[in-house]
Amino acid sequence: MADNYIERQQEQYEARKAAWKQAQKYGKKKTGTTHQVRTGQADKIPSDANRRKRRVFVTGGAEGIGKAIVEAFSQADCLVAFCDTNDASGQQTAKETGSIFHKVDVSNKESLENCVLQILKEWGDLDIIINNVGISNFSPITETSIEDFDKILSVNLRPVFITSRLLAIHRKDLSFPNPYGRIINICSTRYLMSEPGSEGYAASKGG
């Protein structure tokens, strides 16, 4: 039953995706935007547009699951911004979906904070944050250095706190409170079923 349900959901998603791409092909195409976080030169989106659409930020959105998330929210007519270290894939995803790409290494606290603060300044608020970015270094624990372990946590776990904290601080100071908000953290069953060589990854996903 579960397998059939998942298959149906996947088929429905693929159908919506195909329809959206068809509409983009023959209708008005969205234009992707690329931002360098430190420049702060992006045009501000009017406040009335902000009220009509959900404002979404995704970490690690250039490829894989992150890209699928960016595509899904773009198809749902949301305002979508995402960050990634892969410049080429990030620009391509932004072009395909009409989203906004920020080239950011999330393990760099200042870069990630600048990115989130820039988006909050331009959009006025964020309705949804999806902490998706993740890396792994599968190696025996005896061959995993403290630096390797710290790197995994600095990418997989710490950004969850950074993005959530910044949004909480921002919301606290809003003149008109936003009653809507979602913070979605992509986890993994690995934290419950750790295997040899995945100690750092398991710790980061269970954090």
Enumerate the predicted regions with their spans.
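Substrate-binding pocket helix/loop in short-chain dehydrogenase/reductase
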Residues: 140-141, 145-153
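Active-site helix of classical SDR
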Residues: 164, 204
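Active-site loop immediately N-terminal to the catalytic Tyr-X3-Lys motif
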Residues: 142, 193-199
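Conserved glycine-rich Rossmann-like NAD(P)H-binding loop of the short-chain dehydrogenase/reductase
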Residues: 76-91
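Canonical Rossmann dinucleotide-binding motif of NAD(H)/NADP(H)-dependent dehydrogenases/reductases
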Residues: 51-79
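The beta1-alpha1 cofactor-binding region of Rossmann-like NAD(H)/NADP(H)-dependent oxidoreductases
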Residues: 87, 104-114, 146
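Residue(s) in the substrate-gating loop at a strand-loop-helix junction
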Residues: 188
